[in-house]
Amino acid sequence: MNSIESSSNDSNEINKNSNKNNTHLNSNYNNIYKNNSTSSNNNNNHNNIEIIGIDNNKNNNKNNNDNNNNNNNIDKKRKDSKNKQNQEINQEMSENKKIYNSNDSNCSSGSSSGGHVNNGHHILIEENERLEHENQEIQEIYKQKGMEFQKKDLRFGYDVNSNNNNNNGGGSSSGSSSGGSDESASNQPIIRTRNREGSILNLKKQGLVKEISQRFQTPDTASYTRPNANNISIKDKISILKKEQERRKQDSEVQQREKVIVLSADSSNIQIYHPSVLIEKMNSKLDTEEKPATTTTTTTTTSTSISTSTPTTTTTTTTNTSTTNDITIKPKTSPTKNNEERSQSPITTPKQPVEEIVKKVSTPKSNNTSKKTSSDTTPTGKTTKKDKKDKKDKSRDSGNLVIVNNTNNTSSNNNNNNNNNNNNETIIKRRGRVLVTPSSDLKKNIQIYFTIPINPPVNKTNKPNQLLSNTSQQFLKTLISNEIPIDCKINDINDTDAFSDLSASASSSSFITKSSQSLLNVQSLRVKAIKTSFNILFLMPNQSKKILQVKGSDTIENLKERIISDYLFNNNSNNNNNNCKYGADSYLILDFNDNPMERSLVLNKSDYILDKRAQGLIPKLKVIEKSTILDSDPSDELSPSEYEIIRKLIPGTDTWRGEEVEYFRRVTSRLRYEALPLIKGSIQSTLLVRLSPLPIPIVGNKILISIFLPITQVTKTLDLELNETADQFTNRLFTKNYSKHLPNVNSNDFILKVVGSSDFIHGPHDIRTFESIRNHIIQGTKPQLTLIQRPKPELDPQPFKPRFDYPPELIIDHSCSNAINCNNNNTNSTNNNNINFDNWDQITHISIREIKKPFRVKVMGSTRIPLSCIKDIDSSSVIVSISLYHGIECFSKAFTQPIIPPPFAFLAETLSVDWCEWLVFTNIDYSNLPVDARLSISVYSANETVDDVEEIKNLDEATKKLTPIGWINVMITDFKYQLRQGMVELSLWPSDFSNPLGTCSNNPSSSQSVGLTLEFEEFNLPVLFPRKTKFSTSVSVIEQPPTNINSNEMREFFEQITALDPLSDLKQEKYNQLWTLRHYSILFPQVLPRLMLSVPWTQATAVDEAISLLDRWPKLKPYESLELLDAKHANRKVREFAVTCLEDLSEDELLDILLQLVQVLKYEPFHDSKLSRFLLRKAILNRNIGHSFFWYLKSDLHDSNLSERFGILLESYLYACGAHRIELLKQMEVINNLTEVAKKIKPLKDQDRREFMIKEFESLEWPKRFHLTLNPRFESNGLIINKSKYMDSKKLPLRLSFTNTDMNADPIEVIFKAGDDLRQDMLTLQMIRLMDKLWQKEGLDLKLSPYGCISTGDMIGMIEVVLNSETTAKIQKSEGGGAASAFKLDPLANWILQHNKSDMEYQKAVDTFILSCAGYCVATYVLGIGDRHNDNLMVTKGGRLFHIDFGHFLGNYKKKFGFKRERAPFVFTPDFCYVMGGKESFKFSQFVNYCCTAYNIVRKNAKLFMNLFAMMVSTGIPELQSMEDLNYLKESFSIELSDEKAREKFVALIHESLATKTTQLNNFFHHLAHA
């Protein structure tokens, strides 16, 4: 509170007080301007002085005369005390500087001088109202949680305990004045720090609130927000931004306080501001709610202390006896100072006269401030009610001051005193010294300041108007027409000539008119610039760029509607307007700091856009899909029980994390969302017919079909009419048996079902084309069907609950040469239609083609190296080798310097080595790097001393001089086509040299594996590889390829290339010639794989041209395109072209090669690829494909190299497959039960195994109904325990008999193996099945039996049992003679005759045997199947021969004591020939003819088999580890031979096999071993 004291009429007292007041006047002179100007710019600044108001009462006339007399006395003594005064002033300056600096840094937020009120008070009231609402919501939440709510006043600006803490508001030296202080302090606003303990955000973190109310969300979080890449939420980012703004605000305040004008007698040293600058800085918002100081007395209160932490309050009372032209200034003092220290000013300033200032201050306010002070105060100093009412009117006395510089100029000018006396102006004396008269320039500044209105209108902006730079002027000129030229050089603030026309006596109004005119021009330019249209650069979701012309009044929502409609329309390749259903709601707009822009935000109110425009830059915004910022975990799409099923089928899904994983999950989520309308239910999937693409078999006899009628419980046998369809057959059957008994039912209500299988026969298809019917016809058996009521397609629930709609995905395009102008949705606008994006402010990335320097990588160091890898502590060194590969081609190789670890490093358990060495690949630049290049890295130790890198290159990895430590492959790009930059931590795969075809993923056991740290070179922007589909026009390409080839030599060249097998290689000269003739090669589409191998991938222009050719290449046949998917072809575009060709495959054709397609997923560098999308979509839409897809992936899930990629694909399939996930869970439970039993019986003795196995089977709980994993068309409800047994072999497989849910069906016989790797059997049987289909397409049915086989896990799987069959070993033993029966001729013929009594049946069985024997002779020879003894060959009772147990293939025959046990090309023993009637019989000739025909048919499709084997190199099969293992196929297929030569070759092989005795001898020893 201000303590007021009445004036005294005693002249002595007046003179005393006047001198005392004048003592501080000069030192505080600059403080007046500094503090008040700072207060006008920032409402929260704290005043460092108190200004006691100017009194203009008539009662002070006498005091004025006394003051004049006293001033004359002081003038006489001035010269005597000059030196003393200078010392005192200097001391005051140094001490008060310290006080001022400390007070300025520690000042309180509340106003402590004269009751000044903060201008932000009205903002605090709004904040307090919002906090009251928040307080109520918090209290309700505590009630719901049953918790006690501790109420806290979170309001801003008011102290809750102000009544109890009176000292915080002010104090008084006497008891009589304390009451007034308490009353005023109780309502005084105090800025307080907001307590956030009870806030909504904090409650959410504690888990008490799941969702924040819309009222308390910021504009960014009110809509969808994208999670920050650094795991910082939008709310945290907003909080950080607010803190940053507050910090900048405080910095600006400090800078404003330091801006002062030099008050000096020498006008040349005075800093003169431009009038517009002065008006700009001084025309700030005034504190209209300030509490004024009284006119006669003042109480100064200090709320902070420098030396003590507890503030105390002191009050000093002075009486104003000066005239109306005088100003009394009271400085703030520290409570720890004594009275003498309190009289010192906070900042010492040069002594200068102030009479001109006094005149300017008193003149405009004399009429408004003439009030009686003596009547308004009491002797005790308390204020009256009238005084309280007039506080607001009196608050203007200390509000209008000018900015001045704070300088330490103590010089005086005696001439100023004479000038002041001549002009009859009052001279204020300080300590007996006349003050210096202000200079003319200073008077001009003061004159400008005091002519500003009391409450000038100001714009409510955070920042004052800034001066325009030359760049901004130029920017405005380009936007605004030349109606208002920018003539004012407003950035030249030091030009004093602008003030030369002004004199000290010039009126303020004339000057303000001129300065306002120049300022008006600037302001009008800015206003016009805001209203003028401007451009915004949008970065679209497909990485394309678009320019949109907008206005400042546009909102973000309007921009989004315009840009999205244009984006979807121009990217709709089919022009069918399918994209129209997706609106702007599917997208979000972000600024380039990844902050979401509020939908209702006006562009002129966006700080980001305004800042960019002020800098003359084009604003850049990002358009993203909403799905990209949502959580990629789709667990919310399923019920908890359904999600638990997925967790059981694929454990450990939560451990798969990372940016690429989250991106791939979003990709698969989009894919299943798009496929949702096409997903079929359970019944619909079951009713799908299975038609065979093979020719209809021709039989001489009638085809009989057995049908069971459940209603009448009768079995009927009908003849199949010629070309009769399934619907016609059903109608004939219904009419004959049911039409009379069921008059209200027609044949469409029934359907035929295969007994024992889930195959249905219906539709307008020839009944012989159904796969199940065709197999029965080929095998000569009678099909068994049942007539059932047609199942009604049940309303299956959706497989998942969609969370949002995905907009169409568009091709990524980083091309930025042209942009589409979206001005008013008119793409043909001539304004900015073709915009050059080469401007630096519009660059968002760097093209790899622009970096013209060698590629390099820095090897930092390696950790956790096992000591076992270091053979010799003294001489062994550790080396890192890095090779640059593209496919299987190595471009460059580099080595680090060998590092010998110091001896003390071996004291730890593991070893660490540091290189910090750049490896430069001098032969290839960044600009020529292939996008799919990879680094193959090896870390190994040299067992001998190695001096330099050249010696390392001479070492062979296969020698014993090198010990492998670990290896890994790293792509040079990431999944976004961005070049890797910065540090990369790698976890190596152990104990092997580099494998260029191996995985590119890290070892998941990173805590135990060897670590390697690399550093890739960093650039200022992301470095991207071009992904545009259209070929660059900068390269010369023949757009129209030649229509024919006139040169026979050229034609022969292409025919030779296409005739080569995929395993053969060409010389480099041939590849160069092929690339030279690339424009003609399009006439031979099959040459594409070789053409892609001839591309010089280290030449950027050649790569662009190859991609352009690929875009125009004719589509290949599906099987021909498989070669483009093996490891040799690494380019993504090439592999995507191959997948496009596979779209034409039928269901059965896709199932035939699905195993290979799943395996080549390992060759894909990243999770997301066109192949993975293709397979996932096919699996979702077809349950048969989905079943095989699931188990092919599940069987390799144990491999740590593949677990993440295969696991995410499985997870995505299970989310979309609906009820099929329940069936898969049942199958897995059955397999787990069988695996447990199979492992338990192995350590038991033979006599105990069966009894233990039966007990275990009886204790197991089987699902009520489940489909067999081996064949999902078979359905069972349990195990027939009495018929189950274990087999007498090394791995003890289980022979199991499952029940069939069909009443009249036979049991389902399978062999379950635990401990055998069935992947090789799967591959071999797949090839045999494929050969059988190829032969049947050519009309050759060789009666093969490619039984089913599937691997369900690590060394676990199932095999189908061929019923009514026996091994040739048992057949030979049944004839007697023991092991010698292996040399007998008739045992096999006698066994067939025994089961086919009649002559017709026997001849038919013999013919079947000849056909099947021919087929397996060709198949086993071509595939190089080994370990062929009489226990691996079986014959059915119908004479069908087949092979089992394919543990060796590709020519890997067994050896005994270093000798090959198998020397015959294939198994064809004399007893086989005996069944045919001998070598001279006609049937033997038939056999030879069948073999040669089958062999030539297979040779025509040799490329298919070679490609399928090549695609399986990465599976890890022991006998298929590298491409060299496939060399046997080149010999066995003999593609270079003609059909006649090949026929002669195979005839010779038949006779060679028949004459070789080692086969019979091998059978003999096998008999002995198993006797």
Curated annotation (Swiss-Prot):
<feature type="domain" description="PI3K/PI4K catalytic">
    <location>
        <begin position="1280"/>
        <end position="1558"/>
    </location>
</feature>
<keyword id="KW-0808">Transferase</keyword>
<dbReference type="GO" id="GO:0043327">
    <property type="term" value="P:chemotaxis to cAMP"/>
</dbReference>
<dbReference type="InterPro" id="IPR035448">
    <property type="entry name" value="PI3Kc"/>
</dbReference>
<feature type="domain" description="C2 PI3K-type">
    <location>
        <begin position="851"/>
        <end position="1020"/>
    </location>
</feature>
<feature type="region of interest" description="Disordered">
    <location>
        <begin position="157"/>
        <end position="195"/>
    </location>
</feature>
<dbReference type="InterPro" id="IPR018936">
    <property type="entry name" value="PI3/4_kinase_CS"/>
</dbReference>
<feature type="region of interest" description="G-loop">
    <location>
        <begin position="1286"/>
        <end position="1292"/>
    </location>
</feature>
<feature type="region of interest" description="Catalytic loop">
    <location>
        <begin position="1424"/>
        <end position="1432"/>
    </location>
</feature>
<dbReference type="GO" id="GO:0006935">
    <property type="term" value="P:chemotaxis"/>
</dbReference>
<dbReference type="GO" id="GO:0044351">
    <property type="term" value="P:macropinocytosis"/>
</dbReference>
<dbReference type="GO" id="GO:0031143">
    <property type="term" value="C:pseudopodium"/>
</dbReference>
<dbReference type="GO" id="GO:0009617">
    <property type="term" value="P:response to bacterium"/>
</dbReference>
<dbReference type="GO" id="GO:0022604">
    <property type="term" value="P:regulation of cell morphogenesis"/>
</dbReference>
<dbReference type="GO" id="GO:0031269">
    <property type="term" value="P:pseudopodium assembly"/>
</dbReference>
<dbReference type="Pfam" id="PF00792">
    <property type="entry name" value="PI3K_C2"/>
</dbReference>
<dbReference type="InterPro" id="IPR016024">
    <property type="entry name" value="ARM-type_fold"/>
</dbReference>
<dbReference type="GO" id="GO:0005737">
    <property type="term" value="C:cytoplasm"/>
</dbReference>
<dbReference type="GO" id="GO:0031152">
    <property type="term" value="P:aggregation involved in sorocarp development"/>
</dbReference>
<keyword id="KW-0067">ATP-binding</keyword>
<dbReference type="InterPro" id="IPR003113">
    <property type="entry name" value="PI3K_ABD"/>
</dbReference>
<feature type="compositionally biased region" description="Polar residues">
    <location>
        <begin position="325"/>
        <end position="337"/>
    </location>
</feature>
<feature type="domain" description="PI3K-RBD">
    <location>
        <begin position="700"/>
        <end position="789"/>
    </location>
</feature>
<dbReference type="GO" id="GO:1905303">
    <property type="term" value="P:positive regulation of macropinocytosis"/>
</dbReference>
<dbReference type="GO" id="GO:0030011">
    <property type="term" value="P:maintenance of cell polarity"/>
</dbReference>
<feature type="region of interest" description="Disordered">
    <location>
        <begin position="1"/>
        <end position="119"/>
    </location>
</feature>
<dbReference type="InterPro" id="IPR001263">
    <property type="entry name" value="PI3K_accessory_dom"/>
</dbReference>
<dbReference type="GO" id="GO:0031000">
    <property type="term" value="P:response to caffeine"/>
</dbReference>
<comment type="similarity">
    <text>Belongs to the PI3/PI4-kinase family.</text>
</comment>
<dbReference type="GO" id="GO:0005886">
    <property type="term" value="C:plasma membrane"/>
</dbReference>
<dbReference type="InterPro" id="IPR002420">
    <property type="entry name" value="PI3K-type_C2_dom"/>
</dbReference>
<dbReference type="Pfam" id="PF00454">
    <property type="entry name" value="PI3_PI4_kinase"/>
</dbReference>
<dbReference type="GO" id="GO:0051591">
    <property type="term" value="P:response to cAMP"/>
</dbReference>
<feature type="domain" description="PI3K-ABD">
    <location>
        <begin position="530"/>
        <end position="627"/>
    </location>
</feature>
<keyword id="KW-0547">Nucleotide-binding</keyword>
<dbReference type="GO" id="GO:0005829">
    <property type="term" value="C:cytosol"/>
</dbReference>
<protein>
    <recommendedName>
        <fullName>Phosphatidylinositol 3-kinase 1</fullName>
        <ecNumber>2.7.1.137</ecNumber>
    </recommendedName>
</protein>
<dbReference type="GO" id="GO:0031252">
    <property type="term" value="C:cell leading edge"/>
</dbReference>
<feature type="compositionally biased region" description="Basic and acidic residues">
    <location>
        <begin position="283"/>
        <end position="292"/>
    </location>
</feature>
<dbReference type="InterPro" id="IPR035892">
    <property type="entry name" value="C2_domain_sf"/>
</dbReference>
<feature type="region of interest" description="Activation loop">
    <location>
        <begin position="1443"/>
        <end position="1469"/>
    </location>
</feature>
<dbReference type="GO" id="GO:0051897">
    <property type="term" value="P:positive regulation of phosphatidylinositol 3-kinase/protein kinase B signal transduction"/>
</dbReference>
